Amino acid sequence: MKNILIGIVAGEASGDFLGAELIKSLNIIHSNIKFVGIAGPLMLKEKNVESWFSIEELSIMGIFEIINRIPKILNIRNKIFNRLSFLKPDLFIGIDSPEFNIHLEFKLKKNGIKIIHYVSPSIWAWRKSRIFKIKESVDKVLALLPFEKKIYDDFNIPCKFVGHPLADKIPLYPDKYSIRSNLEIDKNSVCLALLPGSRLTEINLLSKKFLYAAKIIKKNIFNLKILVPMVNSLLKKRFEEIKREVAPDLPITIFDNFSYEVMACSDFSIVTSGTATLECMLSKCPMVVGYCMKKINFFLLKKIIKINYISLPNLIAGKKIVPEKIQNECNPEVLAKEILIIFNDKKKYKKTKKIFYKLHKKIRCNSSYNAACSASCLINKLTIK
């Protein structure tokens, strides 16, 4: 039996999770498979995975941060292209990170390699013209969100809505008090989760605001317990440095990972935009979304972004169900005020959790298996369905 080689590139923590679940499913379908490229720590725990570069090399945000790293990023991309062109994998899967992956996919496809792009770029939000480059670069797009497929259908680009792996992994009814017991958290405490980001630039920009907000909330809720999950030791160290500077006396429990558990056992959260907002929704944890960036980045992006919402719960619902506080509105007083509104309005609190449940069911589709089946169709040179 011929061994199967798959090139794969994930660029940040959310892509690492998606990649790990996909690899797990593909390893079940194919016993003779190997993955090479850029993999994160979760992907590397799965069988037959080899990473040529650290995932941290691609985990950056902000226009000027990217500009400063362009030479190194281009060098990595060229090296990956050269290696994969030599190895001729049966399939290449680019997971998210479109600015890195789409160009790589375009060049690999020209070399006769089959291409899947896993996670639709946010063409519905900005730079919709990218869809023409995507059409030239991929054999199939795997979309995580239900409204994305129609966009590709309109341009005759093969696309499958596979659902979201987080929706499959997280139970519809999280056992809040069992999780609290496992984390040694008092079941009678009021818990606030702080999630200032999974990238260093986010930690630097948002941690102070979130911590100051937590100090205000603590003054209003006497039995408040503040929980903070951190995805790696680098971010944890930086967050602790900021805490010592702005809130040395604020009692906080920091967890290594355990992001789902922290959200599921919390009563509410302050969370940055991105996958964490989806995870909060799936954990049935009412939230306030806070996000800011450097002023010049915000000024430039404001000119080109064409959406009404930045958080995934609001985008999936097609309406505002969680408050979003962006840039100047993302300040401690406003964030704290929104959390206290959630805390005091029990009727709205319950309604929000019911909406979260309905949205959870909508995107719970056994997604990793669906994605693996789509990949297998290309591996086996079957007709794309």
From Swiss-Prot:
Pfam families: LpxB. Transmembrane segments: none annotated. It catalyses: 2-N,3-O-bis[(3R)-3-hydroxytetradecanoyl]-alpha-D-glucosaminyl 1-phosphate + UDP-2-N,3-O-bis[(3R)-3-hydroxytetradecanoyl]-alpha-D-glucosamine = lipid A disaccharide (E. coli) + UDP + H(+); a lipid X + a UDP-2-N,3-O-bis[(3R)-3-hydroxyacyl]-alpha-D-glucosamine = a lipid A disaccharide + UDP + H(+). One of its GO terms (biological process) is lipid A biosynthetic process. One of its GO terms (cellular component) is membrane. Its EC number is 2.4.1.182. Pathway: Glycolipid biosynthesis; lipid IV(A) biosynthesis; lipid IV(A) from (3R)-3-hydroxytetradecanoyl-[acyl-carrier-protein] and UDP-N-acetyl-alpha-D-glucosamine: step 5/6. Keywords: Glycosyltransferase, Lipid A biosynthesis, Lipid biosynthesis, Lipid metabolism, Transferase. It is an enzyme of class 2 (transferase). The keyword Electron transport does not apply. One of its GO terms (molecular function) is lipid-A-disaccharide synthase activity. It comes from the Bacteria. The keyword Lipid metabolism applies. PANTHER family: LIPID-A-DISACCHARIDE SYNTHASE, LIPID-A-DISACCHARIDE SYNTHASE, MITOCHONDRIAL-RELATED. Belongs to the LpxB family. NCBIfam families: lpxB. Condensation of UDP-2,3-diacylglucosamine and 2,3-diacylglucosamine-1-phosphate to form lipid A disaccharide, a precursor of lipid A, a phosphorylated glycolipid that anchors the lipopolysaccharide to the outer membrane of the cell. This is Lipid-A-disaccharide synthase. The lineage of its organism: Bacteria, Pseudomonadati, Pseudomonadota, Gammaproteobacteria, Enterobacterales.
